[in-house]
Amino acid sequence: MVTGIESFKEWFKGNESQYAIIGGTACDILMTEEGLDFRATKDIDLVLIIEAVDVAFGRKFWDYVKQAGYEHCNKSSGVPQFYRFSRPTSNRYPAMIELFTRKLDAIQLPDDAVLTPLPMDEDISSLSAILLDDDYYEFLKQGKVTVDGVTVLDAAYLIPFKAKAWMDLMDRKEAGEHVDSKNIKKHKNDVFRLTELIDPTVKIATPSGVYEDMQKFVDRMKNETVDVKQLGLVGRTKEQILQEIGELYAIQ
């Protein structure tokens, strides 16, 4: 279980429609619900649903930040807007919260809020670009589910975000940019682990942009090395899993 998720759940009870947790924490919550283990993760990646967020949510969120006593409070410039809160005073709170919003100043913070500028790293930059894509944002809203009182992106909807992030980081690396290979491997492995939670008989209605990206991912992954046994995926080959992924999504 992610450290601090219980206090987050208690504090934001009643706000389930206003956010969605994605990334490693979402994977951890979904896997835990099914009795499966997941890699250690310490940060909560939070996407605001801008159509549902109001002033009251902004105040409530900042009150949580203050109560947790986060030592570092950072904010990016531009759109999408990104906030990072880290180093709380107690492990009752998440070690880090990373919050994304497509709308500039969607959260109206109080005048006494002190936020320092935040440089964009490769993972943030990649996710920010994905969330600016209308197809992916609509897909995210479509895939929200509540698990044990917390809103997360369901596994079948989380897979395309992980796949897209993997392709984006691979493209950057091939273009000569410095990219942490651990991030590339993380997204790739998460896609395959999440398939453990998928019903192969289900079809997911998918915006055309997301559908096309998933077909590209399947095609590109055919030439990649994936140790399915090391990932704990028993009884399925890489080829079988890729076929399942390719057949999971259908254009809306």
What are the residue ranges of the model-derived segments?
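Compositionally biased terminal segments of proteins
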Residues: 1-252
